[in-house]
Amino acid sequence: MEGKRYRNRTTEICQILAKDECRFAYGVQNLVSLRSEKFEEGYSYHILTDGKVDMLNHLRWLMMLYGRIDEVYLSSWSINATNILMLESWHDSGELGDVNLIVGDIFPAKFKEEWKALVKLRDKGTIARLFTGRIHAKIILARAASGEEIVVETSANANMNPRCEQSTVSVSRELFDFYKSYFDVKFGEYVRKQSAKELTFERLDYEADYSEGTALFGQDD
């Protein structure tokens, strides 16, 4: 049997289809069924899904557990139309504050209508910062209005798919700052690694120079 062929969108993004909204809600409900209360600080929670749970399902889950998210950093190789419109809806409703988004460097050329929609949201103020880069990491950094700083590390992009994905949720200011410092340095850059040198941080020093290669979270003994 010939596999289904997926074509890139050629029409303007304007509304969420009912079937996609149901799929999104299903993914969120799967996560809520795992935990319906806040995560304990200092712990990491490891999750393995059997498909149909994407990156932004996790963000919606956090919003349900913590209420308003004042600031979020998102990195994803790609993002689909449904999730773009979800971000706009949450921001318009006041549930979500500043959105900082980095997508893969090929995204504007490969997903032209989705990129146009993201640029519109940036111009509108929904997205505070929008960049492309040579990135394949899928990360959510969420700062809740209640003060918690939550990190989601996941294999899932911000698009719905039937594949098994894994994620880890941590409430940790140190881990949040570790990733945020990298985002702040690398937003908008096409990173050219000049060496594979690992940087270790004494006393969790997040002002380290990332230009030399890979960053390692941790503290020297």
Question: Where are the model-predicted features located?
Answer:
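PLD/PLD-like phosphodiesterase catalytic module centered on the HKD motif
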Residues: 1-221
